[in-house]
Amino acid sequence: MTLPPKLFDHSILKIRRNRTDENSWFMHDKAIEEINDRLSEINRDFEKIAIIGFRAKSWAKKLNLNATYINDGDLINFDGKSYDLIIHAMGLHWANDPVGQLIQMKRALIPDGLVISVFFGGQTLSELRISFAYAEAKILNGISPRIAPMGEIRDLGGLLQRAGLALPVADNIKFDVSYETPLQLMHDLRGMAETNIIIDRSRKTMTKKFFDEISKQYFHHFSDNNGRINSTFELIFLTGRSEEHTSELQSRPHLV
């Protein structure tokens, strides 16, 4: 089987995740709240649960679930076990082979098992991405991949079908977060371990001149009436089943 080319450097991701800051995990909390709401709408008790992600233990505690914790590398180690609920927690946007991960999850489901994956979508950090582009064009006369590409919801729903999951549903929620400066935003991104891990990323250190230009462009294009900047965070939710079944499952609008 031919594997897709690797886009992300997971060795760097692991290092950065070891340096995360709890005070910057607010988007995980937003995702947990939404997952909790969705699970509460399902008339079913899940007994065999797996949570995939580097913060799986924290997720299980906040969701009040007795779950197995699994790392989210390209190969997911289910250790031969099967589950009726698998939650992929804020990591699929860093997958080199997201379809492959969904297929692995499908294979680890018992009949009528449920997969829920939540991760950052393509509108995340759109303002910072544009500000980087303006600054690079002005200072460096070119544009490099400073922020990792993230999928658009119109495309991501198809991943569920490609993985062979039944009853595929894709939807999103956007959050606007206010900051005093771009530096505060970047501090949060480091605290989340959501900085650039593209293998072909620029290794050059940002100069003060370059960073000042990024800030200038950000404030010029995306500041509000209070002199603060806005940053978009988009959460994508993918939901699928191991097979068609008549058990009750409340779901968001079908978008795939």
List each language-model region with its residue ranges:
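N-terminal, positively charged/glycine-rich alpha-helical extensions of SAM-dependent methyltransferases
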Residues: 1-33
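Conserved Class I S-adenosyl-L-methionine
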Residues: 24, 171-243, 247
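Conserved alpha-helix/loop element of class I SAM-dependent methyltransferases that forms part
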Residues: 26-47, 58
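A short acidic, Gly/Pro-enriched loop at the edge of an enzyme's catalytic core
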Residues: 76-86
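Short catalytic micro-motifs in class I SAM-dependent methyltransferases
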Residues: 90-94
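A short glycine-rich, Lys/Arg-flanked "PGG" loop and its adjoining helix->strand segment in the class I
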Residues: 99-114
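Conserved catalytic/acceptor-binding region of the Class I
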Residues: 118-181, 192-204
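Positively charged, low-complexity/disordered segments
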Residues: 245-256
